[in-house]
Amino acid sequence: MNSFALLLVCIQACLVQSVFSQCTSRAAVAADRGIIGGYGLGAPCSLGYGLEAPYGWAGYADFGYPAGAYGIDAYGGIGEGNVAVAGELPVAGTTAVAGQVPIMGAVKFGGDVCAAGSVSIAGKCACGCGEYGYGLGAPYLY
């Protein structure tokens, strides 16, 4: 019974800590002498090359080099990726392509490829492009 009571006290302490931590904001962390502020990890004199500093983990954002532009983002940061499919793929349907399809790169088929039929893709893109190129359903911006 004592171990069960101790477990309940520990769970209640975690819940109380979680509830009261929601009342404070991140202002204490980003205060003048906090973790990121004037004398903290991103300070210009003490740890100027820390987490938030211009040369720190955040990258070269102040100099116009976004973090995802040079290979930090998925697929090399510039939309490159490889897809390998092996096996028999029985696909039936109709294909209709209308409009502009900007594809740069090469397509290589190896082995016997028997293709007959057509494919039709209609609707919105599902790749995360939206208004201004972000979000679901908006056209690509090039």
Swiss-Prot record:
The protein's UniProt keywords, in alphabetical order, are: Repeat, Signal
What's a single GO BP term from this record?
A: chorion-containing eggshell formation
UniProt keyword Signal present: yes
First and last residue of the signal peptide: 1-18
Q: What domain of life?
A: Eukaryota
Read off the Pfam families from this record: Chorion_1
Q: Which GO terms describe its cellular component?
A: egg chorion
Select a single GO molecular function from the record's annotations and give it.
structural constituent of egg chorion
Q: Where are the transmembrane segments?
A: none
Q: Which InterPro entries match?
A: Chorion (IPR002635)
Function per UniProt: This protein is one of many from the eggshell of the gypsy moth.
- Give the similarity note: Belongs to the chorion protein family.
The entry's protein name is Chorion class A protein Ld19
Q: What is the lineage of its organism?
A: Eukaryota, Metazoa, Ecdysozoa, Arthropoda, Hexapoda
